From Swiss-Prot:
Pfam family, one: Lipase_GDSL
GO MF annotation: an example: hydrolase activity, acting on ester bonds
Gene Ontology cellular-component annotations: extracellular region
Protein name: GDSL esterase/lipase At1g06990
Sites carrying sugar chains: 26, 31, 73, 126, 272
Length: 360
């Protein structure tokens, strides 16, 4: 009930804001301290800035990205403000924002309370990482090992192992894999088909979660796919086949099918890994509800991003010279792939409810 009240208060307040720089959102924690730290892996939905420090064209460390982040800073987050890990960390009473592990200025406190290893543009499929020059999940696991070593230097081996085992671990990836290798280019589709590619990705998810477990993580939430067919970029790609901008049913059906398989796989993994709590995090439901019932959330545009035309703008195509919409809070998406901050708030609150359900 508290979660729904928070959503209502945020959305009601934000209706009075009409410009990108007019507001900064702070979600107050609910005085819950279930976890000593938060550790984050995956892609641009949760990358808080690691790509700033690697050689890749997949970056968001320039305006108008971050125009609603505290200080109106473009931190490398692919949205107009904060992301899922920031809001969850805040709601859980861990900290207000989750820094990227590659930030050279991390404090001991930053390390102790957790960091982000995610890399925008990455996926479970190595083809995705090679296409975008980003950090694969294997490299992210290596970064976790480096993190544990640094944490041990600060608090000692025993305390470090305790922090890692009790930390909330969030994994969010896969969308880039399906977009790049299944729908937009035929590389994997021709060889494996949809069902075969889903099995391939699930195998890679299994291997990655196993690796996290072997390093010491025990409380792991793996997020499923969003309604991929409702992403503006996918609607744009499909315009040659359909004359209107609307969600692509087949791609959404594929997402739902994959998510059910993922949920089943994670349940099986938990039963085989002693002392683990490995569970599925649903983001499909919240995003699809916003896409199909926008009035509930004060949204007026769900098929285009706020940046530029909202149909093709992403990364360097969404820049300081690009026109942006007057009120991002009325848009489900910030650019042609990534949700707006208001959407991330709704998704994060939904995930917090799921975390409480599983772990409380």
């Amino acid at each position: 009930m508290l979660i729904h009240v928070i959503i209502f208060m945020i959305i009601t307040t934000m209706q009075f804001s009409t410009t990108c720089h007019a507001y900064v959102i702070n979600v107050t924690n609910v005085n819950v301290s279930m976890f000593p730290a938060i550790l984050v892996f995956g892609d641009s939905t949760i990358d808080t800035g690691n790509n700033n420090y690697i050689k890749t064209y997949i970056r968001a460390n320039f305006p108008p990205y971050g125009c609603n982040f505290p200080g109106h800073n473009a931190t490398g987050r692919f949205s107009n403000g904060k992301l899922i890990p920031d809001f969850i960390a805040s709601l859980m009473g861990i900290k207000d924002t989750v820094p990227p592990f590659l930030d050279p200025h991390l404090s001991d406190s930053d390390i102790i309370t957790g960091v982000c290893f995610a890399s925008a543009g990455s996926g479970y499929d190595n083809l995705t990482d090679r296409a975008t020059s980003t950090l694969s999940v294997d490299k992210q696991a290596d970064m976790l090992r480096s993190y544990v070593e640094r944490l041990s230097q600060i608090v000692g081996d025993e305390k470090a192992a305790s922090i890692v085992s009790e930390a909330l671990v969030i994994v969010s990836s896969g969308t880039n894999d399906f977009n790049l290798n299944l729908y937009d280019t035929p590389s994997r589709r021709q060889k494996l088909g949809v069902d075969g590619y889903q099995s391939f990705i699930l195998s890679n998810v299994h291997n990655f979660v196993q690796e996290l477990y072997d390093i010491g993580c025990r409380k792991i939430m793996v997020l499923g796919l969003p309604p991929v067919g409702c992403l503006p970029i996918q609607m744009t790609m499909a315009m040659q086949k359909q004359n209107e901008r609307r969600c692509i049913d087949k791609q959404n059906s594929d997402s739902q099918e994959f998510n059910q398989k993922l949920k089943n796989s994670l349940t099986e993994m938990q039963s085989n890994l002693t002392g683990s709590v490995i569970f599925y995090g649903d983001i499909y439901g919240a995003l699809f509800d916003m896409a199909t019932n926008p009035q509930r959330y004060g949204l007026k545009e769900t098929t285009r991003g706020c940046c530029g035309t909202g149909e093709i703008e992403l990364a360097y195509l969404c820049n300081a010279l690009t026109r942006i919409c007057p009120n991002p809070n009325q848009y489900l998406f910030w650019d042609d792939i990534h949700p707006s901050q208001i959407a991330y708030i709704v998704i994060s609150l939904s995930l917090v409810e799921q975390i409480f359900h599983v772990l409380s």
